[in-house]
């Protein structure tokens, strides 16, 4: 009895929830402004790429 009511509740919750669909709608950031996206992605990936080099430079200058 309890299992049936739980199963009905979870399926009704899934059925009632609706999200926008389509390209770019399931991302946690906006892709509408391509220049803002370019700046954000360049900072994100650029900082990840530069971090090891900056750490090595810091270690070499420390000696």
Curated annotation (Swiss-Prot):
TM spans (from-to): 34-60
Species of the source: Papio hamadryas
Subunit structure: Component of the cytochrome c oxidase (complex IV, CIV), a multisubunit enzyme composed of 14 subunits. The complex is composed of a catalytic core of 3 subunits MT-CO1, MT-CO2 and MT-CO3, encoded in the mitochondrial DNA, and 11 supernumerary subunits COX4I, COX5A, COX5B, COX6A, COX6B, COX6C, COX7A, COX7B, COX7C, COX8 and NDUFA4, which are encoded in the nuclear genome.
Subcellular location: Mitochondrion inner membrane
Matching Gene3D superfamilies: Cytochrome c oxidase subunit VIIc (4.10.49.10)
Membrane topology: Single-pass membrane protein
Pathways involved: Energy metabolism; oxidative phosphorylation
In-chain residues carrying the UniProt-annotated modification N6-succinyllysine: 25
Keywords, sorted A to Z: Acetylation, Membrane, Mitochondrion, Mitochondrion inner membrane, Transit peptide, Transmembrane, Transmembrane helix
Entry-linked CDD domains: Cyt_c_Oxidase_VIIc
Protein name, entry field: Cytochrome c oxidase subunit 7C, mitochondrial
Gene name in the database record: COX7C
